[in-house]
């Protein structure tokens, strides 16, 4: 079929299989350009592997370190008459090109919060991956979590705490500057956000993997977080989501103590703001990202998801000098900070100066909103110059993926 983008709110309701594959190939090429190292992870599990930082982790592990990878995600496959989700096509493309490079690649499509997913992963590690993994990447960003056991469904809330938050934002449907107001989260919403986006599920995964004996000696685990700056703090770090990320930090410290007994460790990696399906849903973030992208590009500091993950692996988790990142690359909470360039004073001072100046009339001139829109469309396979969007494309793309029912 012929597929063009249809954007509604912060979601594009259509996806382009070939565009998604080209995105993945672009990330693979960026990774390969930095060389392949053999002193890093060999067997990698990525939980939340189909888009954003999770996908970039999988690409970096496979094509930057030659690792075998197992990816878990929850995506919708395409059919002959309907396109699937971008994450499905991303994962299909990864699988195709990993196998072409002689690397082991297997995927599980299902609820990554479920015990069934954990059981299937453990079975595959035992039967197909040599019995153990040495890196577990936890990269789930879901608005909903079904609790294992009870089946109770919890939902996260992108809300401030204590009082209504009003700020300048972009109406991304109309490309206009508006004042957005968000009501504060209730106590229940805060608690539920911690349950969905905090560290509980990460710990359940490590519990299950450790209990089954499939974590290698020296195994590491990393989960992703964002702290941001005072511009975004009310809605993020000081909001319900921030409480969940504090819980993630506490979990990391518990898991680190456990894994350290066997020569490994666990960290939260604090990453920079990038255009992902997750960040597009957070009010204020599109405007902030449009500003910070412009400033960081002008200073030669810009990084996308693949550049961030490449730096995380090569300069933090697996340093070439053999030293642990803890030597000089963590903050007081033992977090790996990859938001260091974004938080430079010169970058943030420029952002704060720009923020009050932006209007509907000068939005495209003062910020990189055009770049934001382009990156957003790319998430779904659109906006590429090397794809003919008026050409017919097959939407029923199959690959080596186990479907959990």
Curated annotation (Swiss-Prot):
The active site is at 236 (proton donor). Belongs to the TER reductase family. Monomer. It catalyses: a 2,3-saturated acyl-[ACP] + NAD(+) = a (2E)-enoyl-[ACP] + NADH + H(+). Its EC number is 1.3.1.9. Pathway: Lipid metabolism; fatty acid biosynthesis. Keywords: Fatty acid biosynthesis, Fatty acid metabolism, Lipid biosynthesis, Lipid metabolism, NAD, Oxidoreductase. It comes from the Bacteria. It is an enzyme of class 1 (oxidoreductase). The keyword Lipid metabolism applies. Substrate binds at residue 226. GO terms for biological process: fatty acid biosynthetic process. One of its GO terms (molecular function) is NAD binding. Involved in the final reduction of the elongation cycle of fatty acid synthesis (FAS II). Catalyzes the reduction of a carbon-carbon double bond in an enoyl moiety that is covalently linked to an acyl carrier protein (ACP). NAD(+) binds at residues 48-53, 74-75, 111-112, 140-141, 245, 274-276. This is Enoyl-[acyl-carrier-protein] reductase [NADH]. The record marks 75 as: Plays an important role in discriminating NADH against NADPH. InterPro entries: Eno_Rdtase_FAD-bd_dom, Enoyl-CoA_Rdtase_cat_dom, FabV-like_NADH_b, Trans-2-enoyl-CoA_reductase. The keyword rRNA-binding does not apply.
